[in-house]
């Protein structure tokens, strides 16, 4: 029996990776059995630039709720936000991230955060890897024919992979 962060499964754990944003929220759902990764679904929640911000948050919330209902993840992994310049953008992305975390919290689904360095280290084996290296390794690890598009979906899958690897050593 596999036990990951308190979730006992005979065969697998389902992880929802989220790449937060307010224009695009990347998501990736994968199953992990302790050895193998099986990509279930990935994509992006898109919002229109000319839509009022509160309506964008509402749209993100509704679409993420649908993802939770459809795929029933056991855990959510999200990349920790890091911004060095535009505070307005950082605040807006943080609010969109909060909407996604709320969907997990409503279901008592644990949420784990990973820094970009942790994601790169987990997926590529090198914490200073370039974005294209992370995307290519994500494709290879998951056995996909092509790099997931949009990039936000690949980032979300990388966060889910990171969680599966970290949870092996913390459970």
Show the residue positions of the predicted features.
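Phosphate- and other anionic-substrate recognition elements at nucleic-acid/protein interfaces
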Residues: 1-171
């Amino acid at each position: 029996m596999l036990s990951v962060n308190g979730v006992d499964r005979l065969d697998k754990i389902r992880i929802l990776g989220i790449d937060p944003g307010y224009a695009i929220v990347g998501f990736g759902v994968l199953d992990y059995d302790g050895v193998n990764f099986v990509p279930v679904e990935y994509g992006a929640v898109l919002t229109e630039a000319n839509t009022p911000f509160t309506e964008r948050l509402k749209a993100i919330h509704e679409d993420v709720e649908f993802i939770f209902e459809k795929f029933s993840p056991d855990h959510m992994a999200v990349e920790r936000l890091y911004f060095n310049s535009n505070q307005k953008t950082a605040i807006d992305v943080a609010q969109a991230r909060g909407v996604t975390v709320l969907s997990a919290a409503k279901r008592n689904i644990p949420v784990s955060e990973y820094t970009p360095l942790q994601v790169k280290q987990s997926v590529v084996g090198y914490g200073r890897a370039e974005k294209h290296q992370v995307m290519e390794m994500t494709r290879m690890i998951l056995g996909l024919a092509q790099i997931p598009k949009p990039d936000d979906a690949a980032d979300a899958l990388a966060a889910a992979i990171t969680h599966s690897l970290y949870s092996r050593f913390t459970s």
